[in-house]
Amino acid sequence: MAANVMEIYGSKVFNEHVMKERLPSATYKSLEKTLHKGAPLDIEVANVVASVMKRWAMELGATHYTHWFQPLTGITSEKHDGFVSPVGDGTAIMEFSGKELVRGEPDASSFPSGGLRATCEARGYTAWDPTSFAFVKDDVLCIPTAFVSYTGEALDKKTPLLRSMNALSNQAIRVLKLFGKDVDYVSTTVGPEQEYFLIKKEDYELSLIHISEP
């Protein structure tokens, strides 16, 4: 059973292990800078990543892809498109470009905006977040994305987090440089945490007595 778990764990995730194994060395190194240092993503790199990601997903049975995002509804949303592109002679080819990987355009009027924009400004964009690994689920390649309005306002729960992490990195780098540390990027990790402390009942009751005293 344990061996089976190890075989299937992460088997449908386009993680760094898969990237390093399948991407050309130069492409992987460039993408690695984006992942770990926040470097801008070159469109040529995105084209190569998209092609490799499509082949990997198709090997796992995927026929469609979706930009997967978290709008202000409290649940995830998806906009599905197919890899299949019909051609003039009645056949079809499988396509997936860097542009399609990097950006999508769902109808933002279907989602809450907190009054950030007029109802006529319905256009919204999904933008690939390469720091969250793509994965295959139910024969669909799911690409984690941020969701913003056409003027750049956050329409989801991920964009404020990514912007906060970037701001924290910039300020942490300033502090570290004061201490002589030359770094390019500071990674932050967040997650729910709950701690419980066990103390003796008599100590708890004693603390209540002290608190109640004037």
Question: Predicted segments — roles?
Answer:
Residues 207-214:
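Residue-level detector of conserved catalytic or cofactor/ligand-binding positions
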Residues 50-51, 73-75, 101-104, 134, ...:
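Flexible loop/turn segments at secondary-structure boundaries
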Residues 26-29, 60, 163, 167, ...:
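Residues forming well-ordered secondary-structure scaffolds
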Residues 119-186, 192, 197-200:
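Charge-rich interaction surfaces and accessory domains that mediate macromolecular binding and assembly
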Residues 1-13, 17, 21-28, 123-144, ...:
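Catalytic pocket of metal/acid-base enzymes, prominently hydrolases
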